[in-house]
Design a protein with these regions (language model features):
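Short, surface-exposed loop or secondary-structure junction motifs
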Residues: 1-122
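Flexible, glycine-rich phosphate/dinucleotide-binding loops
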Residues: 13, 153-154
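Short, gly/Ser/Thr-rich active-site loops of penicillin-recognizing serine hydrolases
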Residues: 66-70, 80, 85-93, 112, ...
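Short, well-ordered beta-strand micro-motif
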Residues: 108-109, 136-138
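Short intrinsically disordered coil segments
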Residues: 121-125, 182-183
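Short, well-ordered beta-strand elements
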Residues: 135-136, 142-151
């Protein structure tokens, strides 16, 4: 992950996206902040400030899907991965997301797609960012998704529901034309 930083180097500032915001009753978009170099800070929080690229974030999520390993290198133990993607709050509602979700160590976990009205599989784990970054890992479908928008306010568009619906439909269409098989026999007819 060569392009993930808390303090973006000045040499890479031309790769930082501007921040936009939705405004007014017609939902128009305007520039909020152009890319600027910020002096390095010393606070590295888990809640904000990390800058990355789609490619780097995808690699991280692929490592999570692989159980802590990427390209033959182990970064996290299977036990650590399991702790990160297991629900630790029981059947309590997740404040931000509502019913049908659980909470792991660093991820929101989709526990009940029906209650959550999501198109993803149970056990899908995901996280979002302040400027409508969304990424999820669906272990059942062996799928990683990353989308970055750089638009605020957060949650103006429900990317998790919208993008997961599109991805799920693509999987259904793929299965329709190339049905999965078990021992050579199609499992969908």
């Amino acid at each position: 992950m060569e392009d993930t930083h808390y303090n973006v180097p000045q040499s890479k500032i031309d790769r930082v996206a501007a921040v936009y915001q939705h405004t007014g009753p017609n939902n128009s978009i305007e520039l909020l902040r152009p890319p600027v170099y910020l002096e390095p800070n010393t606070y590295y929080g888990g809640v904000a400030g990390l800058n990355s690229t789609v490619a780097d974030y995808f690699l991280f999520q692929q490592m999570m899907l692989n159980g802590g390993e990427l390209n033959g290198v182990r970064f996290l133990s299977p036990r650590t991965i399991n702790l990160m993607i297991s629900n630790h709050i029981g059947d309590k509602d997740v404040y931000v997301w509502g019913p049908g979700y659980g909470w792991g160590l660093g991820y929101c976990i989709l526990m009940d797609p029906g209650k959550a009205t999501e198109h993803l599989s149970p056990g899908t784990f995901f996280w979002t960012g302040a400027y409508n970054t969304i990424s999820w890992v669906d272990p059942v479908e062996d799928m990683v998704a990353v989308a970055m928008t750089q638009a605020r306010p957060f949650g103006r568009v429900n990317f998790l529901k919208d993008l997961s619906a599109v991805a799920s439909q693509a999987i259904i269409e793929s299965h329709r034309h190339n049905p999965p098989t078990v021992m050579g026999y199609p499992i969908f007819r």
